[in-house]
Amino acid sequence: MGKHETSYARVERDLYPTREQWVTEALLAHVDLSGRSVWEPAAGTGDMAEVLKAAGAHVFCSDICDHGYPLNAVGDFTLMDMGRRFDAIVTNPPGGPRNGLAEHFIETGLQHIARGGLLALLLPADFDAAGRRRALFAECAAFRAKIVLTRRIVWFVRPDGKREAPKENHAWFIWEWTMLRGRTAPSVFYAPTDPNSGD
């Protein structure tokens, strides 16, 4: 089942924990964050942060409210200024109505990495297809890569005990400013390379 299927009420504050470890590992297969400072601004229950820490990243966790996982700060990412620079910002952002909040996360993240760094957001695989988002993708010089997930994420456990059958495809979208003049074509990757791994 997907995040926002009509038969399910939207979760308060769009809290959809990325419980499956392979999702974050798919990013790490293409981005080395070992020894890097990483801000997880929608840490939720800490699932993604724990995988990043296990990979050697120094993770700073925040969220708009406390969901029980130890946070370094509590606040709205789109309004926060930590007064420091991070090597990367990595998160599964809340979508909000018509995914407007996710767009705001991209815009805010781009401001935070303006002095260098990487922004990696987990989003629906077709998020870059909307014409109104061209400024964030096709026309954005910082848009660097897309990592298409070859498995579907299970967000909820079915109460009837049956095997979940998620319907939504997702991808990691990556932005990174460089000193190159002009724009280079974004790269497309796929992960995990074995779509049946972890089953």
Regions found by a protein language model. Give the residues of each.
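Class I S-adenosyl-L-methionine-dependent methyltransferase catalytic core
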Residues: 1-199
